[in-house]
Amino acid sequence: MKNTPNPSPRTHCIRCGECCLHSSPTLHAKDLAQVVGGSIRPDHLYTIRKGELVRDNVRGGIAPADQEMIKVRDKKGGCVFYTAEEMACSVYENRPAQCASLKCWDTAEFMELYRSPKLQRQDVIENGVLLGLIEEQEKRCSYAALSDYVRRISDEGEKAVEIILDLLKFDFHLRPFLAEKLGLRVEEMDFFFGRPLTETIVTFGLKVEKQPEGGFLLTRIERNGVLE
């Protein structure tokens, strides 16, 4: 079919849902009131920690995050707040700033917001004990350290693997333990401590298999029958 120019350039949202289906928003400092006020809850969110490999939908490509970012969770079919049946946002009146600024026909406002400060966990969390535990996790399980030990596998072999497994175990067991001790919901852990390293380790070409006795086995991911 021959493409014909649109004689009337779009000037308003037609609720096609493409932006909601494509990806979920990252929160900015402007979104603090919605999070503190409860319109957007911790269980709606997850944190991308500094150094975590992410896809940049604006600049393109995959690269380590240069700063912490808080994102709205995705679900099958787009953003967790998007209701496909109604083609609408369930928190529209309190939607994130990125959503409010995004106009697919004119991205100037969105790009201005994109360059503004991102919301950080320390902006939201007032519990000093919890903030201290987040800092301790970052010291022990930073992506910079994980990336370094992954690179050292080729030279140090099992020694580097054991250190990586220790990092994964600490991060894995920290979550249910603190959920119980601090009265937090398990669904909130990805906001407070980022996604589990046992899941994000795949970005390094590795995967974790949980053993029957409770231990972890670290292996390389096979693609098309070839080990990466």
Positions of predicted regions on the chain:
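Hydrophobic scaffolds flanking metal-cofactor catalytic centers in soluble metalloenzymes
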Residues: 1-228
